[in-house]
């Protein structure tokens, strides 16, 4: 541990205090453990499920089972290759005799010294090949990152759920974005940047989701799928996407009804992005990032979307590191960074709720942002059947 992340010397002009914290960040390698028995039983279960008769499994579930099986098998091979002998063994568990694990040391780096940090493994490839279904499933290229950061959610509980907790920044990007205007120094020509509708969404997300799902008659999905579909709308809007495009691509139909609140949110987010790019704090960074994105051949709007995304992810990562430090101060061991959250090893002598509240206070003191931390389902779910219906 203590290795400087590759790319941290390539940063642009980030806001002063944030830049100073990033410069001091040296704790960017984490020991990650994998449950040996959990990996084995995952492969066995997925083999069995992928061969079930059509009366027991849908065609989509069979594709998902085969995809997860291939991932688990490749994961096993890479884990055997990369597992550090000094980390393998048993995690002490009071009263339980320990859990047999494979251990790996992951180094995290940021691209151009900004945005999120991603995992690497020395001398090994960073990816597991997806295949055609995997690429369509995840809407991205044919490689999926190795490690818990890139692991499908359906497998995480089997791989680490016996001994890890999943700590998450609740509604992370909307919560950050709503607080951004109060942290900007703007030219005199700018008035106040107000986000009343977007702030209401951030605070009452579930009721907004239900209203929008009802308006657009999203009824053929599970509750979790409905929620993710509507959340996707607001993610798109934050980064310059269009209401109409969301309906075409996610609902597979033209936009037939408009939610007035969503239209107001669109207008507010346009003003927010413009203000961030014009601000004293982020203007220099934004100009450099816009130029870098343009050099990739992107059009103007795509450059703006990417740049705003990098800015929010940079703030997110800064907050996440403060959380990591706060947990470590209390004796917790972080194993994995997962964008707006992290995994920590269970310790029966420590109280997770106390750590969550302590980290929230630390984030408020250090960064000025008010966040809510929550534990997502993971710990203790290692014996649950693997979910083949995607949320």
Where are these regions (language model features)?
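Helical catalytic core of nucleic-acid polymerases
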Residues: 142-303
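Short glycine-/aliphatic-rich beta-strand segments at the starts of folded cytosolic domains
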Residues: 300-315
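C-terminal polymerase-core module
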Residues: 241-248, 301, 349-391
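Catalytic palm active-site di-aspartate
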Residues: 166-169, 234, 333-346
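Active-site proximal loops enriched in glycine and acidic residues that flank catalytic Cys/His/Asp
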Residues: 323-324, 337-339, 346, 375-377
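Short amphipathic alpha-helix segments
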Residues: 312-330
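Hydrophobic alpha-helix feature that most strongly marks membrane-spanning transmembrane helices
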Residues: 239, 324-332, 347, 364
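Non-catalytic nucleic-acid-binding interfaces of large nucleic-acid enzymes and RNP effectors
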Residues: 1-156, 160-162, 369-391
